[in-house]
Amino acid sequence: MRFFLDTADPDEARRVRDWGLLDGILLRPEAAEMKGRDARRVLLDLAQVGDGPVIATLAAGDPKAMYKEARELHKHGKNVVLRVPMTRDGLRVVRLLGDEQIATDVGLVFTATQALLAARAGSAYVSPSVGELDDTGQIGMDVVESIVRVYDNYGLETQICVQGIQNPIHVLDAAALGADVATLPFPVLDRLFEHPLTARGVAALRGPLSDGPRRIH
């Protein structure tokens, strides 16, 4: 499983890159705005952090407007992937961009049938949001499981990016189901390192060293 970092902070992306865990980035426009920065400037900065895909979200609108915005955003880097909404017009844009070898990710996906349509349209990625599904009383991972099964049945190459990840259990479940990517915020990724027994073992390893060299009798 690969990790895409859900962030608008280039410093977070660099930290994860230095850990050897940065496979891609998802930039949400609202996240950039919350930091008081222009989303396109942030996109340019993130695209230079690594070679992996950087997913930029298109504003929903008519196909011509989305297509025009997509081509403009793609100029920020060859690794920029354009996220389109799961709508009829969105899938038209997927097809148009695919003809120009511009990769897309279909978002706002909440059923396996929607994911099937995204794959048939030629999207490189599809992003079901488990957190939002869980918040409505559904089990988000059940949808991911269905998508994995459908894609396996037909040999579909669209990669499944599980997003809306809220905790390490979501990461484990997504990995166990065979999803290609976990798209997660920095705090959740950081928590994957932690376990009380690991902390105890690290403390024990530090103990003898902190006492200084011991004299051998």
PLM-predicted stretches and their roles:
Residues E33-L46, D62-K68, V84-E100, T111-A119, ...:
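Active-site-adjacent beta->alpha loops and helix N-cap segments on the catalytic face
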Residues M1-R14, W19-L96, V130:
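Active-site beta->alpha loop and helix N-cap motifs at the rims of alpha/beta catalytic domains
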Residues P29-A32, L108, A124-T136, G178-T198:
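Glycine-rich phosphate-binding active-site loops on the catalytic face of alpha/beta enzymes
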Residues W19-G24, D51, H76-V80, L96-T104, ...:
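Glycine-enriched alpha-helix->loop->beta-strand junction motifs that scaffold or abut catalytic
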Residues R17, A47, H74, L91-D99, ...:
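Surface-exposed amphipathic alpha-helices with a cationic face
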Residues R28, L82, A118, A174, ...:
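Conserved, mostly hydrophobic/aromatic
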Residues Y151-H217:
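C-terminal alpha-helical cap/extension of soluble enzyme domains
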Residues D11-W19, A65-L73, V93, T111-A121, ...:
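Catalytic cores of alpha/beta
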